[in-house]
């Protein structure tokens, strides 16, 4: 193997490794409604073990607002308290927690 081939091979290996190291990118929004962030829109990079999440708040069948974030130990669930429903959604792909 000549030196150019060795360097090319090394570069491919390093770039492949960087793809695995890159963190999960999530949408972050303090308050969203009607598919739009209305307060504090940004992005966060999930730490190891975290996922992207959306917490949606409903009264009856009416969507009141949602919140998007990076979440540690996210578990999907529905919480019913009388007329209020809170739905927690977790996902693990870049920008999967859209507004």
UniProtKB/Swiss-Prot annotation:
GO cellular component terms, A-Z: acrosomal vesicle; extracellular space
Cystine connections: 26-52, 29-37, 44-70, 74-90
UniProtKB keywords: Calcium, Calmodulin-binding, Disulfide bond, Secreted, Signal
Induction: By castration in the ventral lobe of prostate. This induction is suppressed by subsequent dihydroxytestosterone administration.
Keyword Nucleotide-binding: no
GO BP, one annotated term: modulation of chemical synaptic transmission
A molecular function GO annotation: calmodulin binding
Family annotation (InterPro entries): LY6_UPA_recep-like, Snake_toxin-like_sf
Signal peptide range: 1-23
Principal location: secreted
Keyword field contains NAD: no
Expression (tissue specificity): Expressed in prostate, testis, eye, kidney and skeletal muscle. Expressed in the dorsal lobe of prostate. Not expressed in the ventral lobe of prostate.
Start and end residues of each UPAR/Ly6 domain: 24-99
Pfam families per the UniProt record, alphabetical: UPAR_LY6
Subcellular location: Secreted
Entries under CDD domains matching the protein: TFP_LU_ECD_PATE4
Family, as annotated: Belongs to the PATE family.
Function description: Enhances sperm motility. Binds to calmodulin and inhibits calcium transport into spermatozoa. May modulate the function of nicotinic acetylcholine receptors.
Name the UniProt record assigns to this protein: Prostate and testis expressed protein 4
Organism of this sequence: Mus musculus
